[in-house]
């Protein structure tokens, strides 16, 4: 059983978008293979949410900029004594490769947008109970196909996201590992500090405290208020130790 809980909070809009995309892509694989109506609705709802996120911003452009920025950061480490040069070069090649694949890929989510079944289900998701068999006979018969046939179609859908997934995973991994966790202490449930142009806050709390953070701020400055899960009887200690990484 976990004894600590990790919380992550974005400090700018691009990071907020990336974390949402990462979350939705992870959700797509949780209930695979799809064998029933509940699993299908979970899958298609996450597909629909993902397409909505894609339509709100320049996801590809921002990721390509970040891939280039990370390459420049790695270049600055090349001449530092004691640095693993082979590791640096391997990461640079991964970033370069991910950028090449992403820039040459079709519009992100285009294959999913143009799929007839996905489009039909998306139209009904906002209607309470709108995905019944009489509303969506197409989905109904799809769920009665051979499992292998459904699996193959889902694999094709997910494969269309691979250029995005590869680049996003690489970028987020580098950002998350760009700063170590350090012990901090809040006073009367409150903590604030400078962001130092960070993109992401990562905060570790012990589970037995049953507290959660409410975080506000941006890349220059942020504030954390610790709240009890039990809003009526829970207590926040005068001094609370936690671990924080500004990435």
From Swiss-Prot:
GO terms for cellular component: cell division site; cytoplasm. It comes from Salmonella newport (strain SL254). It is found in: Cytoplasm. This is Cell division protein ZapD. The keyword rRNA-binding does not apply. Keywords: Cell cycle, Cell division, Cytoplasm, Septation. The keyword Cytoplasm applies. Interacts with FtsZ. PANTHER family: CELL DIVISION PROTEIN ZAPD (PTHR39455:SF1). The lineage of its organism: Bacteria, Pseudomonadati, Pseudomonadota, Gammaproteobacteria, Enterobacterales. Cell division factor that enhances FtsZ-ring assembly. Directly interacts with FtsZ and promotes bundling of FtsZ protofilaments, with a reduction in FtsZ GTPase activity. Gene3D superfamilies: YacF-like, YacF-like domains. Belongs to the ZapD family. One of its GO terms (biological process) is FtsZ-dependent cytokinesis. It comes from the Bacteria.
